[in-house]
């Protein structure tokens, strides 16, 4: 470990994010007045968003990666709706895995535009990011359009060697 540097592995980040998310969900469901638990939970999303961007670049099969996110989003929606709205289907708010699926689909679209039109990545990412943002807003996915953009920003930073595991 370097001086004044905290070295965390991908596993360390996942465990930290899962712990933060657990504290958040326990606060929401069991201790609704303990706002500090919700604040701790806010740490989870950017860590998971970073991990999704990293996973996109590290996977050997991006199509399967994106499909797995979609399957997890669909499978987890009913338990999410039951836990957070008390009904099996709540079209007004979707779980965070939808946000990550939309982001992966936008990354896939940006890659396709870059390859087919031979555009630099920032130009190819613009229409994909716009579409992802709008879809996140329309679906009312957790963290909405800005959540989708968060994953895309982490992915672009990785492309530009600004941060990676």
Predicted regions and their residues:
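Alpha-helical transmembrane segments and their immediate juxtamembrane cytosolic regions
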Residues: 1-165
């Amino acid at each position: 470990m370097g001086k004044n540097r905290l070295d965390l592995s991908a596993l360390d980040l996942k465990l930290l994010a899962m712990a933060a998310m657990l504290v958040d969900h326990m606060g929401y469901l069991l201790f609704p007045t303990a706002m500090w638990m919700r604040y701790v939970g806010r740490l989870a999303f950017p860590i998971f968003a970073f991990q999704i961007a990293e996973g996109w670049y590290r996977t050997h099969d991006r199509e399967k990666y994106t499909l797995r996110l979609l399957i997890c989003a669909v499978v987890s929606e009913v338990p999410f709706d039951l836990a957070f709205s008390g009904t099996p289907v709540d079209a007004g708010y979707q779980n965070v895995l939808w946000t990550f699926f939309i982001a992966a689909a936008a990354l896939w679209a940006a890659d396709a535009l870059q390859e087919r039109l031979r555009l630099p990545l920032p130009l190819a990412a613009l229409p994909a990011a716009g579409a992802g943002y709008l879809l996140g807003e329309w679906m009312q996915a957790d963290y909405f359009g800005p959540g989708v953009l968060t994953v895309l920003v982490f992915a672009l930073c990785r492309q530009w060697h600004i941060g990676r595991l």
